[in-house]
Amino acid sequence: MPRIGLIVNDGKPLAVQTADTIQQRLELAGHAVVRASSSGGMVGFANPDQHLRLLGYSACVPEGFNNSMALAIVLGGDGTVLSAARQTAPVGVPILTINTGHLGFLAEAYLGDLDRALEVVLTEQWTIEERSNLVVSVMRGDQRRWEALSLNEMALHREPLTSMCHFEIAIGRHAPVDIAADGVILSTPTGSTAYALSAGGPVISPDCPVLQLTPIAPHSLASRALVFSDREPVTVFPATPERLMMVVDGSAGCYVWPEDRVLIRRSEHPVRFVRLVDHEFFQVLRNKLGWGLPHIAKPDKG
C-alpha cells in the first residue's frame, strides 16, 4: 500500500496526540507512515552575523518524503500549513490539512471531522486542488544568498526607527517603477486573504493565474495594489541606503541590503491540497472571514 506522511506541529500537544492516533489507525490499515516535524519548513530569519540560507528550496523536504507517497496529513494551524507546503511542494506530495490551531483558513478539516477524513483517506476518494507557489530568491550579483518557497507572500519593508523607503520594481520585460512606501508585498491569490488584504489589496480567487503587488503605507495616492499575470517574473531593487527586512509567509526571511535584489517568480511546483468535498472559495470567505454577511441592523432611535 502507498506510504502516507504525517507533518506535525510538535510544539502543540493536541497536534502530537492526534498524530499518534492517526498513525496508529493508518498502520492498522496497512499503510507505512513517515512522520516529520513542521519545524523543518520554518526556515527562520537569517541574522546579519549568521550565514544566509545558500541551499535551494528543496532542502526543506523531510527525509523519506518523495513523489511515491499518496499524501501527507498536516496537523496544526495555518502557520503549520505554510511550513508543510515548503516541505511537500518540491516533491509533489498532496497535503490534507487538519486544523488544531485557531482560525484555520487553510484547513480542509477540523478535529471533529477526523473520522470522516480518515475514511476518505483510506478509500482514496479525495480530489486535488493546486495552488500557485512562489520562489523567492535574494541575489547579490550572480550569487544566490537566500531562497525559499512562498505560498502566501513576500513582504519587504523598513526596520523600526528608519525612514520611508523607495523600491524600484521591474515586472517582466517592463521598465521599473518607483514606489515610495514603508514596504511592498508580493502575493499569490492564496496570499490575497492574508497580509495583502490587511494592506488594502483585493481578494483574488485562487484559480486566477495572477500575482499581486501591494504597497504598505504608500506615500502617494497613486500607489495602489496591482494585479498582473503570474507568468511575469518580478525583481525588486532596494533604492534606499538602509538595510530592509524581508519576511516570507511570516516564518522565513532575511535582511536585504542596498546591493541586493529580490527575485520572485512562480514556482514550477504548486502546492497540492487534498479536498474531501467540493471546495467553494466564496463559502470559505463567508464562513471564516465573514465576507458578504448581512449588516447588523442599526438600533432604533428611540
Swiss-Prot record:
Annotated localization: Cytoplasm
Main location as per UniProt: cytoplasm
Gene designation: nadK2
Pfam families associated with the record: NAD_kinase, NAD_kinase_C
GO-annotated biological processes: NAD metabolic process; NADP biosynthetic process
UniProt-recorded name of the protein: NAD kinase 2
The reaction(s) this protein catalyses: NAD(+) + ATP = ADP + NADP(+) + H(+)
Similarity comment: family membership: Belongs to the NAD kinase family.
Keywords from the UniProt entry: ATP-binding, Cytoplasm, Kinase, NAD, NADP, Nucleotide-binding, Transferase
Keyword Ion transport: no
Residues annotated as the enzyme's active site: 78 (proton acceptor)
Enzyme Commission identifier(s): 2.7.1.23
Taxonomic path: Bacteria, Bacillati, Cyanobacteriota, Cyanophyceae, Synechococcales
Organism encoding this protein: Parasynechococcus marenigrum (strain WH8102)
Classification via HAMAP family: NAD_kinase
